[in-house]
From Swiss-Prot:
Chain positions recorded as ATP binding sites: 238-244
Active-site residues per Swiss-Prot or TrEMBL entry: 89 (nucleophile), 183, 185
Protein name: GMP synthase [glutamine-hydrolyzing]
SUPFAM superfamilies listed in its UniProt record: Adenine nucleotide alpha hydrolases-like, Class I glutamine amidotransferase-like, GMP synthetase C-terminal dimerisation domain
Amino acid sequence: MAEEQNPSATFDTILTLDFGSQYTHLITRRLREIGVYSEMLPCTQKLADLPFKPKGIILSGGPYSVYEDGAPHADPAVFELGVPVLGICYGLQEIAYRLGKDNVVAGTAREYGHADLNAQRLDNQGHVDKLFAGLEEHVKVWMSHGDKLVKLPEGFHTIATTANSEYAGIAHETKPVYGIQFHPEVTHTPDGAKLLRNFAVDICGANPNWTMSKFVDQEILRIRKLVGETDHVLGAVSGGVDSTVAAKLMKEAIGDRFHAVLVNNGCMRLNECETVAETLNKHLGINLTVVDASKRFLDGLKGVTDPEKKRMFIGATFIDVFEEEAEKIEALAENSGAKVKWFLQGTLYPDVIESISFKGPSATIKTHHNVGALPKRMIEGQGMKLIEPLRELFKDEVRQLGRELGIAHELVMRHPFPGPGIAIRVLGEVTPERVDIARKADHIFISMIREAGLYDKISQAYAALDPSKAVGVMGDKRVYAEIIILRAVETTDCKLTLGIDGDFVLRYIISVMTARAFPFDNEFLSKCATRIINEVHGVSRVLYDISSKPPATIEME
């Protein structure tokens, strides 16, 4: 997305500068949840290079000590721009350290976990009391720091304390500059969203008008301007939420000049191709081509048992198949005097964040591309250009956008499905027969979850096929048949797992998203097992995986 066309060109924006915390992205998410648009950039960002002026700036937490050589520091222009500034944890220490090198020291006692915060009111002090306005005098907050502010910077008031932090909250006497030692962005700070709203709306004056209804209107206009009146766009779809929403958005913007391609790799869910074709083509009006390459994929998977080799083969073959179909579509377009100049990519904001997150003083910021999913002509620079209409959105915003575009609830709320499909849910060798068993068992399991009204309460659910077999008794005969493993999990993106990193600064490792097995009752699981064994030929046993993540992963391979 061209910078000048970012939502920041239209919506009041709070800029979050990332100092390396693994939950900086939650600041951005919480602000958007209250209707204020926010963008995250690395702390090395030079404000002079910004294409917009933020309404306010938030300095995130981080795993460093501000007084150490090589510690990251914000552009001095942050404090010269004339907009409100809020420092969180490391951000508080950054504000204090720049005003006095002895203001921050290594703490004698680390403070992490829940803490009782006492907010202090300073009457008749103008902006000073605004940060905690509407909050109780005593509130629960989440702390995770080792270093400590031991001196109040000149010109600041104390606005909050805890038993271990004399300066848990500070505010400048005359300027809207604030610092807090706790983390308002996590759910462990119950009133954190209120505090962030106080800062963004009441102190910064940001208009809380960030909605998907306004975004979709702006994005359609942007796409039309970018693509022009004659160029065509090509994109791969899978039936998943991201690709479906991106495809529908493109359809709304340029109509039949968007060409969607669905590749059947032989490892999709039961009736998936037919369902996706009906949804995208008939109901959403998307120009869709379905390529049945199932035999090509399954033949190539014979004898392959290593999960990574499965992924690599499926990924490489997908690119080959997609490329072949793309050439046909391009040829047809050229026959009518048009050209396919753009490739639709379903990049989301978390993908962008992963690329721009601050990883150290010498880290190189790279442009995010999911290279494994790009056609060769994109990699080799043969002319097609990327268009990424969802790259500024979080997953929950993509779902909201889907609803705004009229996509059915059942499709918008679909569980994630891995790119390699059932191939990585069939443990061991992938054969058509084994895929069929896993596919049918999965269909029964998901159908029963839907019938029980549990689907939207579960983050992901599926049936996998174990590489071993087990003895059973059917019709008074001994059988030696397949084992099905059922898995269903609840996940959260903001439940903190404590871990010490660097100078005892505690971080939550977002790449290890936590998940726990969904607590089905035994009667439900028993019914699932009975149906699968009775209806799927070749299955003698059904197990339920109760492992949490970590240490287990959500997928089997």
